[in-house]
A protein has these predicted regions:
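Short alpha-helical segments and helix-capping/turn motifs at coil-helix boundaries
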Residues: 19-20, 67
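Membrane-topology segments of multi-pass transport proteins
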Residues: 1-14, 39-224
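Loop-to-helix transition at the N-terminal end of transmembrane alpha-helices
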Residues: 1, 20-21
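A structural signal for multi-pass alpha-helical bundles of membrane permease subunits
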Residues: 15-16, 22-45, 167-168, 173-206, ...
Length: 462
């Protein structure tokens, strides 16, 4: 960037560079990261590197030996640690020390503990992290550390790491090896095959294309994926058709010369576009409330029905389309209002002389002349609604949920919200690798559909 703005030879690139840099930073970089994650097992159980996961396992310990009740006694600005053997009743006391950092305290047997009040549980809780770093050495040279808010116990490392990478459980004797195919330390059977037990946390490894076949072979993922894909396409197509139809008709009405108060109507019809969409969506969520919403109250009073907008798949999808049409028609109306100005009045005068009516004018003159320049914008609208995450997340959160799936999926989920739920709301853990694979497929699908639409449009109008 500095070279482009400092060198005269690259003067022309100064106007292109900000856009290219923004595209690289906000489009290409996230896309590359998403595709890279799709080829790994990155998930809530496999987030760490191999070295970090190994260190977490090596830091684990188990209780071995006696447990002692402990107390802290204030000694001016310092403290004394007292341990009591619950079996023999013997007391052990340390010298004065200050809390903070790793310390070894030599304890001596004593007949009586210091007089005065010992530290309350609140003080111990506040200093728990520092107390965990204390090692108390008893007269027999045995060492104990804090095991709970009331006790010090003898502890030993739970695992021992051999030079060949073999991990041994010191408590049970079970041996584990790193399985780089799944990203876990896993038990090894006598015949050298992998056992069933895995140690958590796991670590991130590359698994190649494994996430992509899961979308098509796992029954619990395959069924909702294809159903959600079909619904996503239907939703996007319906949204484009309805917003264009409503926007075009309203644009023709407010451009009607005989209509009085056209300016007021235009302002009122454009208002939904002026209100932030997330506010409108939340307002509609309240209006469609099944028990107290104004829409159901009105339908009940007029027709005696109360549709289950959020629990029935069909009515929930209808609600989604209705709300999205409300949010999208002002944009199409504004576009059509501008395009109508470009249609010569001579065409309508000539059709009037031939005896054509309003409907003939609309379908024979207005619609053909508007639809061609609108086509690229309709394709853009289709692509936008294909990934309309905000609408689904705020209005239905994907519900009502589908039953019998291994991933969280709902009847109103679009592919993008389905991907989000897999990544962040999975009941069996967050599966970022699978979500990234689905996101990659969505990218390819949207790109392919856009190319097909553009080619079909070009063939139609050439």
């Amino acid at each position: 960037g500095l070279y482009i703005f400092a060198n005269r030879k690259t003067y022309a690139w100064r106007y292109v560079y900000p856009g290219m840099a923004g595209m690289g930073l906000f489009v290409l970089f996230p896309l590359i990261c998403t595709i890279a994650i799709a080829f790994t097992n990155y998930s809530s159980t496999n987030q760490l590197t191999f070295e970090r996961a190994q260190q977490v396992l090596m830091d684990r310990s188990y209780q071995a030996g006696k447990s002692y009740n402990f107390s802290l006694f204030p000694a001016g600005d310092e403290w004394q640690l007292a341990l009591t053997d619950g079996e023999t009743g013997k007391n052990y006391l340390s010298d004065n020390f200050k809390i903070g950092g790793e310390q070894k305290l030599q304890l001596k047997e004593t007949e009586a503990l210091p007089s005065g009040e010992h530290a309350q549980l609140r003080v111990i809780t506040q200093n728990r992290q520092a107390l965990n770093q204390l090692t108390a050495v008893l007269p027999d040279e045995s060492k104990v550390t804090m095991s709970s808010l009331r006790q010090f116990s003898g502890t030993q490392p739970l695992y021992t790491l051999a030079d060949d990478g073999l991990l041994t459980n010191n408590q049970s004797g079970v041996k584990y090896r790193p399985n780089n195919d799944v990203g876990f330390y896993q038990t090894v059977n006598a015949d050298g095959s992998w056992g069933d037990e895995k140690l958590s946390p796991g670590y991130t490894v590359s698994i190649g294309w494994d996430n992509f076949p899961r979308v098509f072979t796992d029954e619990g993922i395959q069924k909702p994926f294809f159903a959600i894909f079909v619904w996503t396409v239907v939703f996007s197509v319906l949204t484009v058709i309805l917003t264009v139809a409503v926007g075009m008709v309203l644009a023709c009405l407010v451009q009607w010369e005989s209509l009085k108060g056209k300016a007021i109507y235009r302002v009122l019809l454009i208002l939904p576009y002026a209100v932030p969409s997330f506010i409108s969506i939340l307002i509609f969520k309240g209006l469609f409330n099944q028990s107290f919403g104004e829409i159901n109250m009105m339908l009940s009073a007029l027709f005696g029905i109360k549709p289950a907008w959020f629990s029935d798949p069909t009515t929930a999808r209808s609600m989604i389309v209705i709300v999205n049409t409300w949010l999208g028609y002002p944009y199409m109306m504004i576009l059509c209002m501008g395009l109508l100005k470009a249609i010569p009045d001579d065409l309508y005068e000539a059709s009037a002389m031939d005896g054509a009516g309003p409907f003939q004018n609309f379908f024979k003159i207005t619609f053909p002349l508007l639809i061609k320049p609108l086509t690229p914008l309709m394709i853009a609208s289709f692509a936008f609604n294909f990934n309309n995450f905000v609408l689904i997340q705020l209005l239905t959160n994907g519900g009502p949920d589908r039953l019998g799936t291994t991933t969280p999926a709902g009847y109103t989920d679009l592919l993008v919200s389905y991907t989000y739920r897999i990544a962040f709301e999975g009941g069996g853990g967050q599966d970022f690798g699978l979500a990234a694979a689905i996101a990659t497929l969505i990218f390819l699908l949207v790109g392919a559909l856009a190319i097909v639409n553009l080619k079909a449009t070009r063939m139609k109008f050439d």
